[in-house]
């Protein structure tokens, strides 16, 4: 843990701001690897992604080829509408974690995608909370 913290301390905030997802993945216990438990099938995941891409194609227009991850700051403000609870969660995270404008926009892009997977409009608090959870290094560096 100390070596990890030392290494992470060498990564600049502006570099982390350019990475959409920071996820810590714990080791998988051998029992889980050797067991017969099945997760979500690739076919089911593919259907979810196809739904989200269809939602995005409707949003941006046919033939635009634009995906949420490529939205400009202007498009983020246009298409990433949050309900009041979502606004409150995002505001609290920005103030508590000291997030930059770039991190704020990346959270909105990811939250928009999470909402699209559920065909939800507007973006709700749970979508924002999940997107914030994917910013593990922001939280880890801020709470050191």
Predicted features by range, described:
Residues 1-144:
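Basic, amphipathic alpha-helical bundle interface domains used for macromolecular binding and assembly
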């Amino acid at each position: 843990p100390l070596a990890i913290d030392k290494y992470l301390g060498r990564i600049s905030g502006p570099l982390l701001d350019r990475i959409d997802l920071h996820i810590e993945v714990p080791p998988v216990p051998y029992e889980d690897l050797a067991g017969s438990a099945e997760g979500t099938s690739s076919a089911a995941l593919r259907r979810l992604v196809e739904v989200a891409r269809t939602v995005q194609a409707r949003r941006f227009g046919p033939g635009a080829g634009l995906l949420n991850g490529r939205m400009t700051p202007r498009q983020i403000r246009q298409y990433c509408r949050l309900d009041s609870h979502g606004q409150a969660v995002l505001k609290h995270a920005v103030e508590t974690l000291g997030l930059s404008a770039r991190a704020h926009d990346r959270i909105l892009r990811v939250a928009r995608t999470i909402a699209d997977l559920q065909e939800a409009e507007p973006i709700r608090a749970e979508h924002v909370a999940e997107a914030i959870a994917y910013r593990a290094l922001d939280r880890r560096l801020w709470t050191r």
